[in-house]
Amino acid sequence: NILEKGTTNGTISDVDGNFTIAVSSPKAVLLIKYIGYKDVEKAVSPMMKIVMEEDSEMLEDVVVIGYGSVKKSDATGSVTAIKPDDFNKGLRTTAQDALVGKVPGVNVVASSGAPGAGATIRIRSGASLSASNDPLIVVDGVPVDNSTIEGGGNVIGGINPNDIETFTVLKDASATAIYGSRASNGVIVITTKKGSDSNLRFNYSTNLSVSTITEKLDVLSADEFREFVPTVSGVPGSVTLGTASTDWQDEIYRTAFGQEHNFSVSGKVKKNAPYRLSVGYNNQNGVVKTNNYERFTFNGGISPKFFDNHLTVDLNVKVSYEDNQKVDESVVNNALRYDPTRPVMTGSATGADEPGLGYFIWMNGNSPMAIQTDNPVAQLELQDLHNKVTRSIGNAAINYKVHRLEDLQLNANLGYDVLKSKYTKNVPDMAGMMYTSNMKDGTGLVYDSKQNKRNYLLDLYANYAHVFNEKHNFSAMAGYGWQHFWKKFDATTLSPEGKELFSPNHYESEYYLLSFYGRLNYSYDNRYMITATLRSDASSRFAKDNRWGLFPSVALGWKISQEAFLRDSEVLSDLKLRLSYGQTGQQDILNDYPYMTTFTVSYPESCYQFGDKWYYTYRPNGYDSDIKWETTETYNIGLDYGFLNNRIYGSVDYYQRHTKDLLNTINVISGTNYSSVITTNIGEMDNKGVEFAINAVPVHTKNWKWTVGMNYTWNDSEITKLNVIDSDANFVQTGAISGTGKTVQVFMVGQRPYTFYLAKQAYDDDGKPMEGQYVQPDGSISATETKYATDKSALPTSYLGFNTQLTYKNWDFAISGHGAFGNYVYNYVAADQYVQSVYSDQGNFSNILRRTKDSGFQNQQLYSDYFLEKGNFFRIDNISLGYTFQKLWNSSSSLRLTFGVQNVATFTSYSGIDPEIYSGIDKEVYPRPRVFSLSANLNF
């Protein structure tokens, strides 16, 4: 930026540094500014040569930490900040899309490929078992509610990625302990864009996209099915297959189109009130027919200053509305199974007054079969599933620099997070799926649920900072926090005619958090640093005697590169050692009242029928009056480095984490509690890992710039205690597949979380699996389905991210990708199939995978480790090519055009569609699409 000093007259240079400016006087002075370089003031002349000097201090990112900010070079904890230039390129429907593969120690896995879908985010693999492992997410100073909503949803789905200025990830206890009770799993601080002191600026961006599926499951074609079925033993010779040739996967998938538009305006009111307003619209069709995601967003902020800049009021409000026309994800699995010799329609008119409404369904005489796979096309066309979410997050942050004692700042932050959701499911009478549901008589339904959540907070804190004798830098912070969470749920189920089919469902709950916290920072001569924090939290989820938890931390830092023996090094430009220890707490469990007796509305499948109406029952919850905080201790040693004037820079961290008093769900002896399952403090878990990040600028000339970045994480977790008496037979089952009590994973002492627990498949001399034969612990082979801990977990032992960008003048080309290794995937799609499943005793048929035919398994082998596969993969996430037009009609206008491809390619040995499944159980969810996009970004 080039400004005429003392005026608002200015311009910007082109990519080569050339500029022209008309000044008001021959004696004018130009002020030249550029990020990462020291400001230059120079008297104007007709021809000017200006050389700017890099500013190493300015190059240091300022990172946001709890209740304050700090230069990255002064941070003693494990903290990573990424900014818009670092975000993944291409279409970013949700905020978490920008984080994939970007931060060491952070694993982001989308829950499905549906537009607007949520994601599982894990920092250092999580610290708990039965309690939440989600990180705390703080948006502009407001810790947001991350509990789920009915019908699915995305915790931060209402935040427009285009409004985000930075993500700051806090990983070790020194960085997170200031958040105390909710920080055991790390913290992600989202800071949105603010106004600036510059002149009025406008930005418009748009993105047009086309999405396609990358691969279909390999099932038998109609002709192959007609040829194979008669060879299956037990199939009566009198049965007749259909004459159609239907590719059911083709029938449910489509090429999907999407569009996104964003507009923002920023500037200042008079001289002391910068502001920014933005609106956004996103409309994305899913690759599964009828699926659509639509979002409207508004983000507004203004930061007026008063009393000679001593008082700053920062007002922020974010409002979003999401309308998600969902699909029942079972349609993907049903398309795999449905008989390919049957037509989509029966030949009758659509909507015909007959069972199925014109869509093919299996009939037993004149009555639909009660047990059958639903017609996937009918599921899409006849079911109307909508999830509408309105959310607003906002706060008023007040900062007062005390007059005549400006080193002391008083702060108040009042915030809120309010959410309203409405989930509806409408199915007409006589739709095929209404003959296989609870009603089984073809009666349609109108299901309507409403959920309300309110989260209010108040933070009052003071900051004091002073430099003594130019070498002693001291700062302190102390504060008080209060937060209230409330939620309510109501649901009704009616027939299309308005008749009540189920009794109404209602619940309401709340909890409070109360906190006192403080932090001390001291550094000497910009070389030696110490940070200490202390936080005391009370949670209403625990009884009075166990309500308070105390969470301390301490961290040391040493800037080795500032020592005399390295200060003048031409090779080493930065070297800082970090050491930290701290404790954090956990109280995020499903029940807000786990220490007292409560009753919960039953599941729909546990309803009972009285007359023609179904009634919900109430079941007692198990409780533990002595339940208390889960506590995690973390040790961290880290090294930040830079070489060749930071042309090469990065960090290395090693951490050890120990969680005790695990909030764990365990079985208890019947009769000793209201339930045979309770949540209590029992168990311990160890977690350790290494994180490595390196960034380099191999080429940086006048016209060329090439940057490369990579991060790698290794992590290992082990459960060290789980029950009162730990033994091989005393473990917690998890990893449900289908049906009551069917699980394939365990929590077991000596194992990693989510270790697969299966029977060891026996093979013949040719390496072919022997049906119904398993290897026993003594090495013998028998038909006994003896399960064992496989030592193979759904959790990766390592994962990495990679990105590179090449810039030539106004052109830029970028590639990014990520991968995970050491994890295993249970292919339930394949395990749930067997040769005999092609025909049922009722007389209906189901398709199978080609591999099922080849394996020859006649009967279901759900617990065979034959279906457990390596889940290693590396995915090229994004490739983009862009061009920027400078100075379109004035010096401050620019236009950037970008073409991008997402989900470019996945390299894996996994036999299913996609190995990236956080649970490690492949139930054939909505596939991730490949997306082609064209975007434009206009600034003026």
Predicted features and spans:
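Short aromatic-centered micro-motifs
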Residues: 32, 137, 522, 747, ...
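Extracytoplasmic gating/loop element in the C-terminal half of outer-membrane beta-barrel translocons
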Residues: 237-239, 249, 377, 818-902
